[in-house]
Structure formats: C-alpha cells, structure tokens
Amino acid sequence: MKLFLDTNILLDGYFQRTGAVASDAVIAKCDGTTHSGWIAWHTLSNAFYLVRGHSKSAPTALQFIEDILSWAELAETTKADAQQAAGSGMKDFEDALQYAAAIACAADVIITRNTADFKTSVIPVMTPEEFLAAFP
C-alpha cells in the first residue's frame, strides 16, 4: 500500500509532539514490504527549514533529511500538478501541493494530522492513529 505522509507526520517525532508514537509507528511500516512511504518534494525543504530553525544547526537538519530519504519515495510532480494545486480552491496552498503530489504518485491513503484540510480528497485521508487501527 502506498502511504502518502504529510510533513506534520515526519516532524511529530523530532518535535516530540502529541501523537509522535503513532506517527513513528506509521513511518516504521514504510519498509517497502507491505507499505511504502511517499512524500512531496517540497516536504524536504519544509522539514529542513523547521528542523534547522529549532536546532539552529544545518548539519542536524541535513541529517534529518537524509534519514527521511533512507526510507521515503518522492512523488514525481510536474508544472501541471502545481497548476492544479493553485487552482484547486483548497484554503492552504501547501496542503494543495501535498494533495497534488499524493494524486501524482497514486497514493492509497494520505496520512496527516490535518484531515479537515483534505476534506475534498478522493484519496482516503487518515490520522496515524486511524491508520494503525485499520491496518495493525
């Protein structure tokens, strides 16, 4: 199953946020056997920016990115996908880009903490906890 992970799922563990255990459990399932983990290209820059700002260390942020790249696949998107996102009517453009990337990689499910932002999605949207309950 192709799991498309929103940026917030990748950052839960680093920032030790509520729900980090479930997010990390979903990431652990992205081992390429039963499930593969997919992210948008721009997730890398967003994650780098946030981790560097928190840690005040570019090397720490780069290591975080390298860790992601050790298991994640990148959704291949095009100009047309970006245009679709821009014209989608979604309130948050970054979420629209995430959604366009999930469609581009033919994701089976989008895993996010912001399920309300994806209410018009044709792809099922779940929190990490919902996913783990449905696919233990």
Give, region by region, the residue ranges found by the protein language model.
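PIN-domain endoribonuclease scaffold, especially VapC-family toxins
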Residues: 24-92, 96, 100, 121
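Acidic active-site catalytic centers that drive phospho-/nucleotidyl reactions
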Residues: 6, 95, 114
